[in-house]
A protein has these predicted regions:
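Zn-dependent metallopeptidase/amidohydrolase metal-coordination segment
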Residues: 7, 230, 311-371
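Active-site metal-coordination/substrate-binding segment of hydrolases
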Residues: 74-138, 147, 353-354, 358-359
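Midchain, well-structured core segments that form catalytic/ion-binding scaffolds
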Residues: 145, 150-294, 300-304
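Acidic/His- and Gly-rich active-site-bordering loop/insert found
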Residues: 1-105, 128, 324
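Active-site-adjacent substrate-binding region
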Residues: 210-218, 290-335
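Generic non-transmembrane alpha-helical segments
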Residues: 7, 11, 18-25, 41-49, ...
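Acidic, glycine-rich active-site loops and adjacent beta-strand->loop/helix elements
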Residues: 83-85, 103, 140-147, 169-173, ...
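Secretory-pathway/membrane protein signature
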Residues: 1-13, 49-51, 83, 184, ...
């Protein structure tokens, strides 16, 4: 008798081979050629099982991909996995994919090259089992998640609005699901003054604004406004004609996002020092993702499917944002952390726990089957 769990376990070496191929491609968010190469590898793999790829081309960033089976009609489940990493050109040459016992290493191995393997093989497993559930999914493989999904946000939200739920394949820290995430945004403030020995200081104007911006931080509410980068001036003995700052914002709720956004724009709408001029750009790029009753019901289904195969799944709130922030904002229940288990994302020590590949592939396949049978 054919066994789903057994078949998936037998595919572990194939999954690792795909992961090695993907890891050994430099695909930092701004490396378009590398990301598109990753996209070509994945679209080729999906084509082998009759999934069609719709390419959303971009000039500077990698092309986003929308993938579904050629016989799919109004699929209800959205799967999202990003193809970019935080690592620059040449990283792979210095530390390519490697394996040591139950662990695999390499740039982006857990965040999130391994998730592409578990996703592909979950769909293959459903096909092998005779299920039709693989026709009920649509995948967005985006290319800029690590820099805020600014270019892919419109596509994600557009597709999400046609779905009943979203499953985000970010890696699972300690095996936990993610049910909530902070929102965030980035702003850039430029200040123009006048250069002279007795001119109008752009740096002084910026300094006054920084104090007001930092005063927006409210730790009890989970609001953090931080000016993390500043620059300005031309020499130590002249008044600075120009200064600029980069501002990072983290918020707990949608409402706080609106409040902080308005406050930042108000602070930067006028000059403290006569003769200076301010330019502000940016916004809340990721709305906060808060747990809803619909998402709790989705968690219940996922945890039940995990328990059937010995996985005790907990869910937690995470500080960093992901594409689940966008799908939740679009109005559909969303759960994150469905990828394989690993840790140290964005670090040289990043790793994948190899035994989790089969476990998370089986979990994803069973969840898709369960959601498709309702």
């Amino acid at each position: 008798m054919w066994n789903l769990k057994g078949w998936i376990k037998q595919q572990e070496s194939n999954m690792l081979e795909l992961i090695e191929t993907l890891v050994n491609i430099d695909s930092g968010s701004y490396i378009k050629q590398g990301i598109d190469k990753v996209g070509n590898v994945l679209s080729g793999e999906y084509a082998k099982i009759d999934f069609e790829t719709e390419v959303h081309e971009q000039q500077k960033l990698g092309n986003n991909l929308l993938i579904r089976h050629r016989e799919a009609v109004n699929p209800e489940i959205l799967l999202i996995a990003h193809m970019d990493t935080v690592f620059g050109e040449g990283t792979v040459a210095g530390r390519p994919f490697s394996r040591e016992g139950d662990y695999a290493y390499g740039p982006g191995v857990i965040d999130m090259k391994a998730s592409h393997a578990t996703t592909l093989y979950a769909l293959k497993a459903l096909m092998e089992s005779g299920s039709e559930a693989f026709k009920n999914v649509e995948l967005v493989l985006n290319t800029d998640e690590e820099i805020g999904s600014i270019a892919s946000r419109e596509l994600i939200e557009q597709v999400a609005k046609t779905k009943k739920c979203a499953l985000i394949l970010e890696p699972a820290q300690n095996g936990h699901l993610v049910s909530e995430r902070k929102g965030g945004g980035k702003y850039f403030l430029k200040v123009h003054g006048k250069s002279a020995h007795a001119g109008i200081s752009a740096i002084e104007e910026l300094a006054r604004k920084i104090l007001k911006l930092h005063a927006l931080t409210d730790w009890e509410k989970g609001i953090n406004v931080n000016v993390g980068l500043i620059s300005g001036g031309t020499s130590v003995n002249t008044i600075a004609p120009f200064a600029e700052a980069a501002i990072d914002v983290r918020i707990e709720t949608w409402e706080d996002g609106d409040t902080v956004d308005s406050a930042i724009k108000e602070i930067c709408s006028y000059s403290e020092i006569p003769g200076t001029r301010l330019e502000l750009t940016g916004n809340i790029t990721r709305p906060a993702w808060n747990l809803t009753a619909e998402a709790e019901a989705l968690i219940a289904i996922i945890t039940e499917e995990g328990q059937k195969n010995g996985l005790e799944l907990l869910h937690e709130k995470s500080g960093g944002g992901s594409d689940a922030n966008l799908t939740s904002f679009a109005g559909i229940p969303s759960i994150d952390g469905l990828g394989p288990v690993g840790a140290d994302a964005h670090q040289e020590s990043e790793y994948l726990y190899i035994p989790s590949l089969a476990e998370r592939t089986l979990l994803l396949a069973n969840v898709i089957e369960r959601l498709s049978s309702k």
